[in-house]
Amino acid sequence: MELRFPRFSQGLAQDPTTRRIWFGIATAHDFESHDDITEERLYQNIFASHFGQLAIIFLWTSGNLFHVAWQGNFESWIQDPLHVRPIAHAIWDPHFGQPAVEAFTRGGAAGPVNIAYSGVYQWWYTIGLRTNEDLYTGALFLLFLSTLSLIGGWLHLQPKWKPSLSWFKNAESRLNHHLSGLFGVSSLAWTGHLVHVAIPASRGEYVRWNNFLDVLPYPQGLGPLLTGQWNLYAQNPDSSNHLFGTTQGAGTAILTLLGGFHPQTQSLWLTDIAHHHLAIAFIFLIAGHMYRTNFGIGHSIKDLLEAHTPPGGRLGRGHKGLYDTINNSIHFQLGLALASLGVITSLVAQHMYSLPSYAFIAQDFTTQAALYTHHQYIAGFIMTGAFAHGAIFFIRDYNPEQNEDNVLARMLDHKEAIISHLSWASLFLGFHTLGLYVHNDVMLAFGTPEKQILIEPIFAQWIQSAHGKTTYGFDILLSSTSGPAFNAGRTLWLPGWLNAVNENSNSLFLTIGPGDFLVHHAIALGLHTTTLILVKGALDARGSKLMPDKKDFGYSFPCDGPGRGGTCDISAWDAFYLAVFWMLNTIGWVTFYWHWKHITLWQGNVSQFNESSTYLMGWLRDYLWLNSSQLINGYNPFGMNSLSVWAWMFLFGHLVWATGFMFLISWRGYWQELIETLAWAHERTPLANLIRWRDKPVALSIVQARLVGLAHFSVGYIFTYAAFLIASTSGKFG
């Protein structure tokens, strides 16, 4: 018999309909469901695929370096980072007429190019790269790593090199190696790079392999380290009039705690960053020696978990049984990893703009907006994925006997209380926030803006004041010059920090008012509702009062037939599906808020945000409509301009988004009838009927159509906003 796709499922391969293709694609990565899978092979397959993932990442980053070196303007950008537009790569399109060629030829290029809004120029400049040759070297090195990763992946699929199951289940060794090796050593190596290459480069000293051993990063070398006078490394830092990349105003310190920003670049002091990475390295190198392996010393994670019984016994058996539950469930481990990574990615979004670490990136407004939005969307997808795999864990891997009365079992026991509290919080936030917005809308519409309900966010302002913001006059903690907190840090980082917090030209602790109060609560509504849907999906994944045997139906099922009413749309997959819409809408509010507040800050008219953000019409008119006007003007009677591509993408994004509803708001029978009619017509049409298909065409399943609809909705939503964001920001600020 001929081998047909999918090879991993003979049952599916023999399906006579097009279901074979779609279900084959859908389950290609669900290794657990494949024929002849064993637990050991499952782990080996996933392990080998990690090498492929690394290869793709290295190839991609290599491509970035290569194209900028080949077609970019890195060397001329370095001469004037604030006015030269960084080029990502050249573009060639046979459709371009002369107006298009002229519109897209910028940044000092000879032909049409794309401008880089990713921040790579600022990053490479900060870490000490200075020439195209440096970029080519980096590209080749990453290409080498990519090849190495592919070889590693292939190697670990060979019988002699396949790790055993016991190797994968050795949690302590893995933790030690990842903490010390991955985080500790890499942070130490990065500190080394910053101290030996990046900091000298910021002071006009070009360190490469040929002079690496001759140039001391600090005049006294290792002397202060060996004699215990570590504070010497912080003496003589760069002065406030230091010109980045030159010797003018440069100091000699390598590890400092200055606080605040470099006045010229508006980014964190490189010597502060090096100090931070050294501290991280120190912590992780210690952490990576904590767990017991072959040597009989250190902690056993299992013992740690078993020992933690809650006091008084009222909270059950604590963490007993958790070690084996987590160690034997890939979905649990993936859920934990995704939850952590999702939070970290969102934190990256928040910190990249408020505490920028790359030189001059804070003044590249479009890049700031693009990076914030990019990281928040990625965080949203990763976090919803965490709950999806949490639900799969409960369906496939959870063993009630192993987890009797521990924290997992008690979560399931108390799920009604958890879900109803989340529901109450969501309802409260939703009705009150919408009520305030709508009230304010009506007041504006009737010409009585003074009757708006405007609430000052006094608690948030108090927190900002505690961190040193003096605008509000709270006179507390770091904003009080007489307090112990103020005096303790006065000789170290505090002056730099206070200067940064109270200088209104950066994004650190922006002044907030009633508009911020409302939008924060709108975002809180979105976060709580998304969480409600995800938590309910996971906690009800095994069963509910309505459907106690739900776990027997798997992760994604449409319904249990017509005989059991009400069993449609309640699979754990359906909860994930619904949560993604809420996640996207929530991040929409987050990014609208961030972008509008920053546009008014950058333009110097913060009063526009403050006055218009307290009612919905203000958001629709003064943010969305006002800022999309240039976008809609991408093509006009006078020809085209450099925003035309974004105008096209804006339209295309709407098209993709709207297409999603065709899959979301229709039923399977309609499509089945349509397909059969089209197949009938095809078979009776001359010439066309020469083309035959082996698989009988059938409509997508309900779950698949939902996935296709969700994918279109998500992609269209993000494309539309990306075009709006980049065009409206670059149209104003270049």
UniProtKB/Swiss-Prot annotation:
Its EC number is 1.97.1.12. Chlorophyll a B3 binds at M662, Y670. GO terms for cellular component: chloroplast thylakoid membrane; photosystem I; plastid. SUPFAM superfamilies: Photosystem I subunits PsaA/PsaB. It catalyses: reduced [plastocyanin] + hnu + oxidized [2Fe-2S]-[ferredoxin] = oxidized [plastocyanin] + reduced [2Fe-2S]-[ferredoxin]. Its main location: plastid. It is a multi-pass membrane protein. This is Photosystem I P700 chlorophyll a apoprotein A2.
